[in-house]
Amino acid sequence: MQYRLEYAQPSQRQAYAESRWASPPAELVEVGLRRMLPPDGRSACRLRLDLDEFTQVYGTHDGSQALVAARAELLAPRGDTVLARRDLRITEVAPRPDASGGVVAHRTASRRLAEELAGWLAGIASAPNGGDAIQRACAR
Protein backbone atom coordinates (compact mmCIF):
# COMPACT_ATOMS: atom_id res chain seq x y z
CA MET A 1 0.00 0.00 0.00
CA GLN A 2 1.32 3.40 -0.94
CA TYR A 3 0.83 6.76 0.69
CA ARG A 4 2.02 10.31 0.18
CA LEU A 5 2.71 13.01 2.77
CA GLU A 6 1.32 15.97 0.86
CA TYR A 7 2.21 18.38 3.65
CA ALA A 8 5.92 17.37 3.64
CA GLN A 9 6.90 15.61 0.39
CA PRO A 10 3.97 15.94 -2.04
CA SER A 11 5.64 14.24 -5.01
CA GLN A 12 7.19 11.28 -3.16
CA ARG A 13 5.27 8.05 -2.65
CA GLN A 14 6.07 5.83 0.29
CA ALA A 15 4.93 2.34 1.24
CA TYR A 16 3.46 1.02 4.47
CA ALA A 17 6.01 -1.46 5.84
CA GLU A 18 3.49 -4.00 7.14
CA SER A 19 0.49 -3.52 4.82
CA ARG A 20 -0.04 -5.01 1.38
CA TRP A 21 -3.00 -5.26 -0.98
CA ALA A 22 -4.35 -8.79 -1.52
CA SER A 23 -3.77 -8.25 -5.27
CA PRO A 24 -2.30 -5.43 -7.33
CA PRO A 25 -4.62 -2.37 -7.19
CA ALA A 26 -5.42 -2.61 -10.91
CA GLU A 27 -6.74 -6.15 -10.40
CA LEU A 28 -8.83 -5.07 -7.40
CA VAL A 29 -10.38 -2.24 -9.43
CA GLU A 30 -10.99 -4.59 -12.38
CA VAL A 31 -12.85 -7.09 -10.19
CA GLY A 32 -15.03 -4.31 -8.79
CA LEU A 33 -15.75 -2.96 -12.27
CA ARG A 34 -16.72 -6.40 -13.57
CA ARG A 35 -19.20 -6.74 -10.71
CA MET A 36 -20.69 -3.30 -11.22
CA LEU A 37 -20.62 -3.13 -15.03
CA PRO A 38 -22.24 -6.33 -16.26
CA PRO A 39 -21.24 -7.34 -19.77
CA ASP A 40 -23.42 -5.73 -22.39
CA GLY A 41 -24.07 -8.29 -25.11
CA ARG A 42 -25.23 -5.52 -27.44
CA SER A 43 -21.87 -3.73 -27.64
CA ALA A 44 -18.73 -4.92 -29.39
CA CYS A 45 -16.67 -1.97 -28.13
CA ARG A 46 -14.08 -2.33 -25.41
CA LEU A 47 -13.32 -0.26 -22.33
CA ARG A 48 -9.68 0.38 -21.47
CA LEU A 49 -8.91 1.76 -18.03
CA ASP A 50 -5.43 2.91 -17.04
CA LEU A 51 -5.04 3.33 -13.29
CA ASP A 52 -2.70 6.28 -12.72
CA GLU A 53 -2.99 6.70 -8.95
CA PHE A 54 -4.17 4.47 -6.10
CA THR A 55 -2.66 6.17 -3.09
CA GLN A 56 -3.55 7.31 0.40
CA VAL A 57 -2.73 11.02 0.64
CA TYR A 58 -2.07 12.68 4.00
CA GLY A 59 -2.89 16.38 3.87
CA THR A 60 -2.07 16.70 7.57
CA HIS A 61 -0.55 14.46 10.25
CA ASP A 62 -3.97 13.23 11.33
CA GLY A 63 -6.06 13.31 8.16
CA SER A 64 -5.90 11.38 4.91
CA GLN A 65 -7.92 10.47 1.87
CA ALA A 66 -7.81 7.83 -0.82
CA LEU A 67 -6.96 9.09 -4.28
CA VAL A 68 -7.93 7.00 -7.29
CA ALA A 69 -7.08 8.55 -10.66
CA ALA A 70 -7.66 6.80 -13.97
CA ARG A 71 -8.01 7.33 -17.71
CA ALA A 72 -10.89 5.57 -19.44
CA GLU A 73 -11.12 5.02 -23.18
CA LEU A 74 -13.93 3.48 -25.18
CA LEU A 75 -12.27 1.59 -28.04
CA ALA A 76 -13.65 0.44 -31.36
CA PRO A 77 -14.25 -3.32 -31.68
CA ARG A 78 -11.11 -3.79 -33.78
CA GLY A 79 -7.88 -1.91 -33.43
CA ASP A 80 -7.14 0.85 -30.97
CA THR A 81 -9.35 3.63 -32.35
CA VAL A 82 -10.51 5.73 -29.41
CA LEU A 83 -14.20 6.63 -29.69
CA ALA A 84 -14.43 8.47 -26.36
CA ARG A 85 -12.07 9.36 -23.53
CA ARG A 86 -12.49 10.50 -19.93
CA ASP A 87 -10.13 11.34 -17.09
CA LEU A 88 -11.42 10.43 -13.64
CA ARG A 89 -10.17 11.55 -10.25
CA ILE A 90 -11.93 10.27 -7.15
CA THR A 91 -11.07 11.20 -3.57
CA GLU A 92 -12.60 9.71 -0.46
CA VAL A 93 -11.82 10.76 3.12
CA ALA A 94 -10.37 7.92 5.21
CA PRO A 95 -12.18 7.24 8.50
CA ARG A 96 -8.80 6.79 10.24
CA PRO A 97 -5.32 8.06 9.32
CA ASP A 98 -3.78 4.60 8.98
CA ALA A 99 -3.58 1.72 6.50
CA SER A 100 -6.92 0.20 7.55
CA GLY A 101 -8.62 3.57 7.11
CA GLY A 102 -7.02 3.79 3.68
CA VAL A 103 -8.48 0.41 2.73
CA VAL A 104 -12.00 1.56 3.67
CA ALA A 105 -11.57 4.80 1.70
CA HIS A 106 -10.13 3.01 -1.35
CA ARG A 107 -13.03 0.55 -1.38
CA THR A 108 -15.52 3.44 -1.43
CA ALA A 109 -13.49 5.40 -4.00
CA SER A 110 -13.28 2.35 -6.28
CA ARG A 111 -17.06 1.88 -6.09
CA ARG A 112 -17.55 5.56 -6.96
CA LEU A 113 -15.14 5.15 -9.89
CA ALA A 114 -17.26 2.29 -11.23
CA GLU A 115 -20.44 4.34 -10.77
CA GLU A 116 -18.93 7.29 -12.67
CA LEU A 117 -17.79 4.99 -15.47
CA ALA A 118 -21.26 3.44 -15.73
CA GLY A 119 -22.84 6.90 -15.93
CA TRP A 120 -20.29 8.06 -18.50
CA LEU A 121 -20.89 5.01 -20.71
CA ALA A 122 -24.67 5.43 -20.47
CA GLY A 123 -24.30 9.12 -21.33
CA ILE A 124 -22.19 8.37 -24.40
CA ALA A 125 -24.87 6.12 -25.82
CA SER A 126 -27.57 8.74 -25.36
CA ALA A 127 -25.53 11.81 -26.35
CA PRO A 128 -27.26 13.95 -28.99
CA ASN A 129 -24.02 14.71 -30.84
CA GLY A 130 -21.94 11.68 -31.64
CA GLY A 131 -23.97 9.13 -29.71
CA ASP A 132 -25.38 7.60 -32.89
CA ALA A 133 -21.93 7.29 -34.45
CA ILE A 134 -20.58 5.53 -31.38
CA GLN A 135 -23.61 3.22 -31.23
CA ARG A 136 -23.05 2.28 -34.89
CA ALA A 137 -19.34 1.67 -34.30
CA CYS A 138 -20.12 -0.54 -31.30
CA ALA A 139 -23.04 -2.46 -32.84
CA ARG A 140 -22.58 -6.20 -33.05
Which residues are covered by each model-predicted region?
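Surface-exposed short loop/turn segments
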Residues: 31, 35-79
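N-terminal segment of the mature soluble domain
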Residues: 1-50
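Short, highly charged C-terminal tails/helix-capping segments
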Residues: 119-140
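Generic preference for hydrophobic/aromatic residues in regular secondary structure cores
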Residues: 1-5, 65, 89
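Short secondary-structure boundary motifs at beta->alpha junctions and helix caps
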Residues: 10-20, 79-119, 123
